[in-house]
Amino acid sequence: MKMKKYLSIAILLMMMALPVVFTSCGNDDPTEDIGNPETKLDVWTEPFHIMGANVDEVKSYMAQSMKRYRQVAETSGDNIPLTYMTGQGSEGVLYSFSRLDGSLYSVIDTERSVNRGLVIDYLKKHYTLVSADEASLQYCFTNQDKSMVITTMKVSDSHFNVNYSLVY
């Protein structure tokens, strides 16, 4: 009777120890970040932002011009948000489309803070600067016909948003 009891306990202990042994003997570090969180871009590509465009136009642009992003969500029905992400955690682009006609009216691009200089310089070259607060990373730009407003906002120490909004 005692031998069966000890055998059961020994088997249970072996089952509990096996995952620890295999995990500790592996070369992978489970606490290691996937990818380099400080990946700096050489060239920043703007997300698709032609207001009034449809979902298919956005998907086509993303597939051709922004290959580091992959589509992760699409909701249909009354509201059609379209979400793309990179493999780098919180980087991504959220597209919002109108319930009435399915046209694009808002884009939110989340980028790493390490790339803020590259992004801000690009926006300064291609749009009219309306206001700037470098300390808080809040910039406001507009396009030539003032039909769109582009704003930037710090969302954390490691990320910031670039928002494209249609002006009605």
Regions found by a protein language model. Name each.
Residues 104-105, 139, 148, 160:
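Hydrophobic residues embedded in beta-strands of well-ordered beta-sheets
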Residues 152-168:
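Short, low-complexity, Pro/Ser/Thr/Gly-rich segments in the mature regions of secreted, periplasmic
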Residues 73-76, 121-146:
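Short Gly/Thr-rich strand-loop-strand
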Residues 26-121, 125, 166-168:
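Short helix/turn-capping signatures at newly exposed starts of structured segments
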Residues 91-99, 146-156:
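Broad, structure-driven detector of short, well-ordered beta-strand segments within folded domains
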Residues 13-19:
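Sec-dependent N-terminal signal peptides of Gram-positive bacterial secreted proteins and lipoproteins
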Residues 20-24:
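C-terminal motif of bacterial Sec signal peptides marking the signal peptidase cleavage site
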Residues 2-11:
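Bacterial N-terminal signal peptides that target proteins for export
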